[in-house]
UniProtKB/Swiss-Prot annotation:
Keyword DNA-binding: no
Predominant localisation class: cytoplasm
Keywords from the named record: ATP-binding, Coenzyme A biosynthesis, Cytoplasm, Magnesium, Nucleotide-binding, Nucleotidyltransferase, Transferase
Domain of life: Bacteria
Organism in which the protein naturally occurs: Kosmotoga olearia (strain ATCC BAA-1733 / DSM 21960 / TBF 19.5.1)
UniProt site (Transition state stabilizer): H16
UniProt name for this protein: Phosphopantetheine adenylyltransferase
Compartment(s) of residence: Cytoplasm
Enzyme class: transferase
Amino acid sequence: MKAIYPGSFDPITYGHMDILKRASKIFDEVVVLVMKNINKRYFFTFSERLSMVEKAVEGIQNARADSYEGLLVDYARKAGIKIVVRGLRAISDFEMEIQVAHINKAMYADLETVFLMTDPKYSFLSSSIVREAASFGGDVSLWVPPYVEEALKRKFSGST
């Protein structure tokens, strides 16, 4: 059974990767889908985010990266995927995610959402926290892979 793990991944963190690795043990294939949310302003470009996700899936045999600029349900339907994986850090995540899951289900009746609780050591972690810490020169190596840390340093130094 295939699953989609969608997100902005701006940038991908060890919290995202924890959910990905655990999902890859449950499902036959996991597509990590880099998406655009019209309500978000991104730090990294779409292609930069996809490139980082491609590196993140390299060591996971049954995971692959992809990107899409439309509705998740449209991608899922076209790809024949009926499972969406989402990570939850706190009850506030659940409140938003349950709404999205219901909307997705209304648009694609066969689509189910599976929630995985994040590892407690990542329960505070978000891409925005990583970006903020990196913007002040903080050490983000506990939260992101080395290639993401380097990309953050390049962006904040102005040498993209």
